[in-house]
Amino acid sequence: MLDRRIFSDPNGNEVRWVVGSAWPYIYAVPHLGNLIGSLLSADVFTRYLKLKGYDVVFVTGSDEHGTPIEVEAIKLGIEPRQLTDRMHEIIVKLLKLWGIEPDNYTRTESEVHKWYVRDAFTKIYNNGYIFTKDDELPYCPRDKIFLPDRFVIGTCPYCGYPYARGDQCENCGRLLEPRMLINPKCAICGSTPEWRLTRHWYLDLRRLEDRIRSYIEGNSALPDNAKQMSLGILKEGLRPRAITRDNKWGIPAPFPGAEGKTIYVWFEAVLGYVSATIEYFRRLGREDDWRRFWFNKGTRVVFFIGKDNIPFHTIIFPALLMATGEDYVMPWTTSSTEYLIFEGKKFSKSQRVGIWADEAIALLPADYWRFYLIYNRPEQRDSNFTWDSFLDVVNSIMNDTVGNFIHRVLTLAKRRWGTVPGDVKMIEQDQEIYGKVLEILNTVEEDYERIMLKDAVSQSIEIARIGNKYLNERQPWRLSEVEFNSAIYMLMSIVKTLSITLAPVIPFSINELWRMMGYSNGLRWGDARKPIEQGLRLSEPKPLFRKISKEELNVMLKKLDEIRDIKDKGKYPWEQAYLPNP
């Protein structure tokens, strides 16, 4: 559980935020599990921070280097950059459709990123943390290429998982090397690899082990899954890790004698959080402002990642920052989710198990998916997406509890008022109800600050339930004018509070709600404690959401199959993405 003290600094430093989402590998469109584990959760938390008025930068981008892209480009007879240019464009469009708004969504092919990575590794090399070693590495005689770790698959020596990659077992999370695998195979063609001699450059993690252990043990903000996994790896002892590869597609290694080598994609991609911040402020014409974030002890750096990415963010990335010899602020915490599974199974494109970001947005508006995914976020255990649960959340909670309450209140207010009266006050009974809502608001705020986004949504729903209960029991339309005005004033104030607590989760709907309530500009978190402003001109209310029937679901599933039939016909990856026509 996250320590709330991250929202204040005991030494009086100004608190700033760098929010980083795991960079999507743009070999393909991300699925819902990818989104909830990183991009969507990071967007929701960033929106909360901005509502609070914090100085925050949300950075992420397209991870486009490495063997998978290189191999796919060879198969298609095109250059890797041709593939990544098109896929990057598609991801940018999808993020806009989903309402995911990084301050800088960049790419690992950006000139700033390539410059920063080479500069950082030059400093690390000059500081003596890098050495060379001649290794026998897996080489596929059929494909005639050296195989990066992740392109060797076999049985994990720790847990027996038969499809472990040569860099990490996705089942138990252990960091691996290809030689550790039992019965290794080439992931491209299935051939048994040969071992051939080649020279590579290594990061000597052993020399950084004590500092990394001290950093992790002393960090009360790390969630349990991240802390325990990291300490488990440290207990076994850190080993040097090869940071170069024989790929052509990547960032050229800057070390003397390393011509023809590129930086291993995992070691350059994590540095993207810094390079993306630099690039963001360069675009704003504020060249040195990035230092206010990365060299300020009051900065809170938080990563939104899946649990399989924990070691790269709690061990590798801090190690790289330490090895530069510069006084970087260390990452404060990770929000490392468990897995989202689909109808009890792992997401699988080939078996059509799951839903992908492009498919989802073709079926329903983004806020339906955003609400459900955050409501069902796998924060402490795996979550299971089922169509039945999706219908239940959309129909019973999103529409009936939240949407229906808002629409009933706005309809009453518009019908009797049109404009919020200037002399209206809450009677004592209504003040007590409003006070209970403000108590729940405190809990919602705590949940956001602990990055328990699922709990924040659940508590927001409780606010709507209080309003619905009041409407059903009090029946304001039967009251005297004074009591009616008090009731609607209180209920409109509850709607205002509710809208702010849900604004990070369903921004499209809340912006429309604010328009209907008469707000020309967006609200801030502090406004959630203030009653509705008098004099607001109300617009004609429209329902924010609608129910989805079983019959409509069947139509959606049929459309989903049709979309996938279209995607399957595409030769190129960008032809296998489904985007609405502009």
Swiss-Prot record:
Stated role: Is required not only for elongation of protein synthesis but also for the initiation of all mRNA translation through initiator tRNA(fMet) aminoacylation.
InterPro entries to which the protein is assigned, alphabetical: Anticodon_Met (IPR041872), Met-tRNA_ligase_1 (IPR023458), Met-tRNA_synth (IPR014758), Methionyl/Leucyl_tRNA_Synth (IPR015413), MetRS_core (IPR033911), MetRS_Zn (IPR029038), Rossmann-like_a/b/a_fold (IPR014729), tRNAsynth_Ia_anticodon-bd (IPR009080)
Lineage summary: Archaea, Thermoproteota, Thermoprotei, Thermoproteales, Thermoproteaceae
Enzyme Commission number(s): 6.1.1.10
Record's keyword terms, sorted: Aminoacyl-tRNA synthetase, ATP-binding, Cytoplasm, Ligase, Metal-binding, Nucleotide-binding, Protein biosynthesis, Zinc
Signal peptide start-end: none
Pfam families hit by this protein: Anticodon_3, tRNA-synt_1g
Protein family: Belongs to the class-I aminoacyl-tRNA synthetase family. MetG type 1 subfamily.
Organism: Caldivirga maquilingensis (strain ATCC 700844 / DSM 13496 / JCM 10307 / IC-167)
Cofactor note: Binds 1 zinc ion per subunit.
Protein name: Methionine--tRNA ligase
NCBIfam families per record: metG
Motif ('HIGH' region): 24-34
Residues reported in the UniProt entry to bind ATP: 349
Keyword Transmembrane belongs to the record: no
Cofactor needs: Zn(2+)
Keyword flag Signal: no
HAMAP family hit by this protein: Met_tRNA_synth_type1 (MF_00098)
Main localization category: cytoplasm
Matches recorded under SUPFAM superfamilies: Anticodon-binding domain of a subclass of class I aminoacyl-tRNA synthetases, Methionyl-tRNA synthetase (MetRS), Zn-domain, Nucleotidylyl transferase
GO annotation terms (biological process): methionyl-tRNA aminoacylation
One MF annotation (Gene Ontology) recorded for this entry: ATP binding
Catalytic activity: tRNA(Met) + L-methionine + ATP = L-methionyl-tRNA(Met) + AMP + diphosphate
UniProt superkingdom: Archaea
GO cellular component terms attached to this protein's record: aminoacyl-tRNA synthetase multienzyme complex; cytosol
